[in-house]
Amino acid sequence: MLKKLLLTFSVVLFSFFNISLTKADLLFPNNSIFPADVIKIQLNALMDNDSKFKDSGIEQTWNFAHPNNKKNTGPLPNFKMMIKGNSYKMLLNHLSHTITALGSSNEWAQFEVVILDKEKIYHKFNWQVEKFTMDGPLRGCWLTTVVSNPIPLGSSI
């Protein structure tokens, strides 16, 4: 009985420790990450959404969402539903992407993002990041404020 209890406890402890380590692998904003790199981090994570744990790509993307954006989308479970919905599901496990700078200032940067989804259809997005200017741990960090609805560009075939 004691051995069985100890084994069960060990399995639960190992599972908890393993989950904690994988979530620790996610990147968090810091003021040394450039605007285009924020988008690269988000797109690379979404490209392999379940690589670290279920929905790790979505959670990685959430980490770089501007607080105002998070207020609009609601908590993380709502954000996950939004990304998995019709408007943005093509971002999940997409095959490739390109990021092209459209314009910037010291406070914002806008990019055109074209992704090739797993159905081999291209989609274009306008993606904007802004430098967080309020006091706190995010001060000076570039964070996503806007991702447009996708514009389908057609098939790659």
Regions found by a protein language model. Name each.
Residues 1-9:
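Bacterial N-terminal signal peptides that target proteins for export
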Residues 8-16:
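Bacterial N-terminal signal peptides
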Residues 18-24:
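Sec/Tat signal peptide C-region and signal peptidase I cleavage site
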Residues 29-30:
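Alpha-helical scaffold domains
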Residues 34-50, 64:
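Short, aromatic-enriched amphipathic alpha-helices that serve as compact interaction elements
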Residues 52-108:
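Short solvent-exposed beta->alpha transition segments
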Residues 101-157:
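Exposed beta-sheet edge and beta->alpha loop/turn motif
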